[in-house]
């Protein structure tokens, strides 16, 4: 394993640990999820470039599209909870159920 892949794996693990530690606050969780998606995107892109897999070069782009959708839904939930309750605690998300 090269140093770059080790650093990206370490960045993913730190972001995963951040999701676990800051799971009460939605904003911190969203930032950690974005860090995880960014490290996965870079790892997938570098792996595809390293192995010269030109037929699968659309996978990183698809991953970015899903990451943008995840960020949009997360920010919509953040705006809804902060406008309704004045805080970004995830415990308030149970109150949004129909």
UniProtKB/Swiss-Prot annotation:
Listed GO biological process terms: ATP synthesis coupled electron transport
GO cellular component: mitochondrial inner membrane; respiratory chain complex I
Enzyme Commission code: 7.1.1.2
This protein's UniProt keywords: Electron transport, Membrane, Mitochondrion, Mitochondrion inner membrane, NAD, Respiratory chain, Translocase, Transmembrane, Transmembrane helix, Transport, Ubiquinone
Membrane topology annotation: Multi-pass membrane protein
Segments crossing the lipid bilayer: 1-21, 29-49, 59-79
Pfam family, one: Oxidored_q2
A GO molecular-function descriptor: NADH dehydrogenase (ubiquinone) activity
Location(s) in or outside the cell: Mitochondrion inner membrane
Similarity remark: Belongs to the complex I subunit 4L family.
Subunit note: Core subunit of respiratory chain NADH dehydrogenase (Complex I) which is composed of 45 different subunits.
Function: Core subunit of the mitochondrial membrane respiratory chain NADH dehydrogenase (Complex I) which catalyzes electron transfer from NADH through the respiratory chain, using ubiquinone as an electron acceptor. Part of the enzyme membrane arm which is embedded in the lipid bilayer and involved in proton translocation.
The name this protein goes by in its record: NADH-ubiquinone oxidoreductase chain 4L
Species name: Zaglossus bruijni (Western long-beaked echidna)
Gene name of the encoded protein: MT-ND4L
């Amino acid at each position: 394993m090269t140093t770059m892949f080790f650093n990206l794996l370490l960045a993913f693990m730190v972001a995963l640990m951040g999701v676990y530690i800051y799971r009460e606050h939605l904003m911190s969780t969203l930032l950690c999820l974005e860090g995880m998606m960014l490290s996965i995107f870079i790892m997938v892109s570098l792996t595809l470039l390293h192995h010269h897999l030109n037929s699968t070069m659309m996978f990183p782009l698809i991953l970015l599209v899903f990451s943008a959708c995840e960020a949009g839904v997360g920010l919509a939930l953040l705006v809804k909870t902060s406008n309704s309750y004045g805080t970004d605690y995830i415990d308030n998300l149970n109150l949004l159920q129909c």
